[in-house]
Every structure is written in structure tokens, then in C-alpha cells.
Amino acid sequence: MAVDMDMPILIVDDYKTMLRIVRNLLKQLGFNNVDEATDGAMALEKSRARQYGLIISDWNMEPMTGYEFLKEVRADTQLKDTPFIMVTAESKTDNVIAAKKAGVNNYIVKPFNAATLKTKLVAVVGDF
């Protein structure tokens, strides 16, 4: 089954530069329906207001981290099946294990490029 290239994607990061980079990488890959949030609390609010086909979130943010946001998403019956990719500079094995246990679908360590993002996207949402 082909991936819906118009599916809404939520990217979450507290750094505007990173939001712009991820948005541009997604655009290079053909995804244009992208929304943004700058912390987990804002992302949770947006996720409850709109059904996203994919969430890509940073780990380290305040006041709600990406990890806390992930746990909230997985605990919410309406959101629990939303594909979720964690993006972070944290490559510690403990963080990867914690994210996997919390239900993350994939994990990307910064810095990354379009090829890395595409590989992770294909693993989560399918080929495009």
C-alpha cells in the first residue's frame, strides 16, 4: 500500500532551526502537510485537535519533554496508534531503550540527513 504523501505530520522541537530543517527534509521527500509545535504540551494539544499520520518529536524540551509527550500519546485511546519517531542528540542506550519501552516506532540521532530520515520513515509508515 502506498503512503499518503498528503498525510498530516506533526514535528515537535523547541529549536526553530531544527523545525525548519526537518520541515525542509520532509518537503524534499515529498511531504508538504506539516504542522509544528515547540514543546510536548503544545504538541499534545495539537494532537488531540487533529489526527496526524505521523509525529516526529525531539526528546529534550520544556515544559513537557518529547519522552513525556510520547507516553501521553500512547496512553490516549484516540492517539495511541499514531506512528511516532523520536529525534534527539541523545544516543545513550538507556534513552533508546526507554523510548522503545514507551512505544516509539523509531529513533533518529542528530545530526541526520534526508536519506536517514527516509529510511526511518519507510520503516514506520511504508515505502514511498
Q: Which stretches of residues belong to each language-model region?
A:
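Two-component/phosphorelay signaling modules centered on CheY-like receiver
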Residues: 16-35
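Short amphipathic alpha-helix used as the core "switch/output" element in two-component signaling
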Residues: 45, 67-80
